[in-house]
Swiss-Prot record:
Name of the protein in its database record: Phosphate acyltransferase
Organism annotation: Shigella flexneri serotype 5b (strain 8401)
InterPro entries given in the database record: FA_synthesis, Phospholipid_synth_PlsX-like
Compartments, record wording: Cytoplasm
Stored HAMAP family: PlsX
Amino acid sequence: MTRLTLALDVMGGDFGPSVTVPAALQALNSNSQLTLLLVGNPDAITPLLAKADFEQRSRLQIIPAQSVIASDARPSQAIRASRGSSMRMALELVKEGRAQACVSAGNTGALMGLAKLLLKPLEGIERPALVTVLPHQQKGKTVVLDLGANVDCDSTMLVQFAIMGSVLAEEVVEIPNPRVALLNIGEEEVKGLDSIRDASAVLKTIPSINYIGYLEANELLTGKTDVLVCDGFTGNVTLKTMEGVVRMFLSLLKSQGEGKKRSWWLLLLKRWLQKSLTRRFSHLNPDQYNGACLLGLRGTVIKSHGAANQRAFAVAIEQAVQAVQRQVPQRIAARLESVYPAGFELLDGGKSGTLR
């Protein structure tokens, strides 16, 4: 394994350095080839490194940042006032080649805008998309995008997302000839928005995409598709609804029957069932798949949940490591070059999203 350097916006997210710095130390323990650049306020970071040993400190560097982009700031305002912020400086480290990827739990809109401004989209990509890999009930994985980077998406963008998601599923998740579906309100051809139906028509013409049609939201975790494509608004609502239900379910498994009097054998049975069911469904725990890759850029950017805990942020760091090792941007660029003549000639240069 070759050495990797990642830039962490340690000031972003709901909990800032109190979560991101311990997660950074956890990541260093797990990967001896990893070096981390901690971008943020040194006064907030340094005390949290007290438990770091000499070896860990040799693979850490604090990059001082003057400010933090607020989580509730409007993206346009945040971008204009971003100079000197921890998020922008972390992205600039990637742009300058000092880091191979950036991880941030900060403002999603600002991260999207700054990443597009500084790192630039790949040739043929109009706007990047947030993508994550979710587990499903068959113990496999499903690539889902967009998860909030683009609220409104035209047919061109949906087709581009499908291509990028297919590459990610094949190259990172290692699914041969991945099935691709569009999230819709029904499986019938006439259902859905014009943008979805137009994207469907184009995807059918691209030989390198294994397009299988529409999928409804209630089948997200069934394993019926390997890649699920949607606009950012729908994807974000779907993901957060699913995560809320899973967290509630796992919580109920742990608390069921607490405080009630039971015979000793019923208590033993209850505890056995709790442990058994918790193990059976633990792979659905949202903390285990935190970290959405901002796909379609010339560099690697990972967006962590703002409310991520230490374990979840460490998972986001690992997502960045995998994306760099698998050369995701380069592989997407290569696939786009091969796909353009076959399918994108039907689109207006990847700009307008209208069929010719």
